Each structure stands twice: as structure tokens, then as C-alpha cells.
Amino acid sequence: MTKKFDSTLEGHFNIRYKSSQNVRGIVQLPHGTGKKVKILVFAKGDKAEEARAAGADYVGDDDMIQKVQSGWVDFDFVVATPDMMKDVGKLGQILGKRGLMPKPKSGTVTTDMKGIIAQLTSGRIEYRADKTGVVHVPMGRLSFNPDQLKDNAEAVFQAILKDKPSDAKGDYVVGMYVAGTMTPAIRINIKELR
């Protein structure tokens, strides 16, 4: 018996973009991405126990730092308590280039383990524009029903508009396409998302 491949549906939002504008943000997808994420938490003592209880896949301090330094990167998100950041900073070369370095601005440097782990496991994603002004975002699986995919697309669209730089003029999102992992892209009428 073969297992059917459930393709990820990605949204590609074309934005009117100047390279001087830093286009990035965070959005909570109402129906998640459909992907089971692995979370690594750097914490000690009570916060480590809290992270384990909240559902973190990997929790530790110096032992996990050494494991990552040896090349292990089998996780999707990294969270750290503020007191661990001095040591986690040593992993900047490894985590930074993969976009996994914990940052206070993204909420991944925190003492609220229960809150951040709940967000990460329920469909919170970070997005940023590439050099050409396109934001690429996973919006769910092809097995999702159309209303779930539409809700997720609207959430991303509204988040991008909310994070619009103040000096951006005119229409900010100028096009949207969706494509599955192994499917052609389809243009979406963004007027229906407004």
C-alpha cells in the first residue's frame, strides 16, 4: 500500500518593494500549516520543565548547545530563555544562516514557554520578502478544505498589509500566486482577499 503525498500549498505575494524597506513579520495561521514542527528550547531548571510540559521536542542547555555545534539541525524552531542567550549566541553561525536564531522581536527569546510553544505548534509563521520583493509563505496542505486555505491566505495577506512600511506608496501587494509542491502556480485575484 502506498501513502498519498499531501503537498504543501505555498502562497507567493508580490509586493511593491524598495530594497531599503525591511519587509518581514509574523502571522498566526487560523488553520495551521498542516506540518508537525520540531521545537528546540534552550532553558534551565523550571523553565526547562515548563518547556517539556508544553510539548517542546528537545530541551536542554549546554548539552544541546554542544549538539548543535557538532552539526545537528533537525528542528524547525528555536526558543531560548533570556539567561541562555549569552551561550546560544555562540551558535549564531549555525542558526543565523538558517533563520533559526532566537530573537526578542520575534518572541522566541522569552520566559513564557507555554505561550510560545502553543503558538509555534498551532501555525505561527515568520515571513520576509526576498530580494525580488516576493513573500513566500506555506499556507497549508492540499488536503485542507478550500475555506481553510482561504482563511489562511487572508490571514497572511492582512498581516503583510498591516506590516506595510510607512513610506510604501500605492498598492502594496500587487499580485498573489499559489502553488503546491509539485504543481504549477495559479494567479489569485487579490481583490477577493481585501
Model-derived regions: residue spans:
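Translation machinery proteins
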Residues: M1-E49
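Flexible glycine-/small-residue-rich
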Residues: F13, A43, T81-P82, M139-R141, ...
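Flexible, glycine/charged-enriched surface loops at secondary-structure junctions
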Residues: F5-L9, D163-G175
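Intrinsically disordered, compositionally biased charged tails
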Residues: D167, R187-R194
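Long, charge-patterned amphipathic alpha-helical coiled-coil/hairpin "stalk" segments used as oligomerization
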Residues: Y58-L161
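Residue-level signature of catalytic and energy-coupling elements of molecular machines
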Residues: A51, G96, V178
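Ordered, amphipathic secondary-structure segments that act as subunit-interaction surfaces
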Residues: I39-A56, D62-M64, M85-D87
